[in-house]
């Protein structure tokens, strides 16, 4: 589209159709120049052009045409028709111009939105920098506030955690003390009950062992009330007590052995038997120590010892009872027999064998005398029927001593005889008969002159206890 007043199609049509006067042409030129200036000014300032700037009624061409038509004289009909056609064409051109103006205004409006002036750009830049500065300052302030809150909250949380831990420690400490107090009370109650049971059991059942008490105590109880430490201490004390008792018994056996050995040595010297003096006594001590260490001590307990106030006597070699000595006269007659013509040294060995057999029982006799009254005679110490018959056959020369364990020397026969339960001394047939079905301590001197006999060769028929003397 061309500019108005610059030689467009509308001006060309108007010049050809209407030939205006010079005044009209000057006016039209002024109007066109004014319109061009207005358009240029609008384009430079980039203002939005509205449709109000181009009203259809105020068009200069239309007003000029109307004035020209009004001023023209209507002289002839042809001119009128021609004027009507020109008016119609002018109206159509005006409408086309209005449409073009509207399109141009729309284009200007759309182009003006995307374009900015330098002032607007500078203002926008200044505002953006200022707003960025404000945002950065707010961010720094926010960061400082967050750090301060973190520090304050961290200290507060730390203090709160420390306070909580202290409270928990105090609570645990109180619970521990309460539990310890309960355990102490339960322990004292159990200890008192245990002592009462021990006293009651010691008064009612003095011969009852610690094993039975232990089985009675093993009833359903609370496990935390059982004091294992006190039980272990009690067991250790009882074990030490039993060991001390064993040592005392051993010392008494040593002393009694030494005393009997000295008496036997003096008797041999008075009769004229061979004696070695102190060497023989020392040899007897060594032999007794060796024999006692080789024998199993069944009295030592591997389990818990006896309870307080109770005493279990250690087992000793059993005495030959009446049932053992009166089994059969044939058996007692088949024991080892020795001729009267036995040498004196062999007789001394036999006497020593009998002595040591009763020396080993010295400790038991001492404990037995403490427990039994002196007037009471047990059944195993009573003389048997065979012993009474042999004493009756022997005559009044030998006196039966049922309660004596000590061997005595018969000066008339020059033979050592022992009278007591389980030991028969007879002169009938010139033989010394000894019956010991129980275990005995071997004689160290007589071991060289006798050897064990197998069960098939044993003349007594007792198996391993049979001994054959080689003359």
UniProtKB/Swiss-Prot annotation:
Its main location: nucleus. SMART domains: IQ (SM00015). Disruption phenotype: Insensitivity to abscisic acid (ABA) associated with disrupted activation of Ca(2+) channels by hydrogen peroxide H(2)O(2), increased frequencies but reduced transient duration of [Ca(2+)] cytoplasmic oscillations, and leading to altered ABA- and H(2)O(2)-induced stomatal closing. Abnormal [CO(2)] modulation of the cytosolic Ca(2+) transient rate and strong impairment in high CO(2)-induced stomatal closing. Reduced induction of XERO2 in response to cold and ABA. GO terms for molecular function: calmodulin binding. It holds the Pfam family DUF4005. Residues 137-145 are annotated as: Calmodulin-binding. Residues 119-147, 148-170 form the IQ domain. Binds to multiple calmodulin (CaM) in the presence of Ca(2+) and CaM-like proteins. Belongs to the IQD family. May be involved in cooperative interactions with calmodulins or calmodulin-like proteins. Recruits calmodulin proteins to microtubules, thus being a potential scaffold in cellular signaling and trafficking. Involved in abscisic acid (ABA)-mediated signaling pathways leading to the production of hydrogen peroxide H(2)O(2) and the subsequent [Ca(2+)] cytoplasmic oscillations-dependent regulation of stomatal closure. Required for [CO(2)] modulation of the cytosolic Ca(2+) transient rate and for high CO(2)-induced stomatal closing. Essential for both cold and ABA induction of XERO2. This is Protein IQ-DOMAIN 21. It comes from Arabidopsis thaliana. The gene is IQD21.
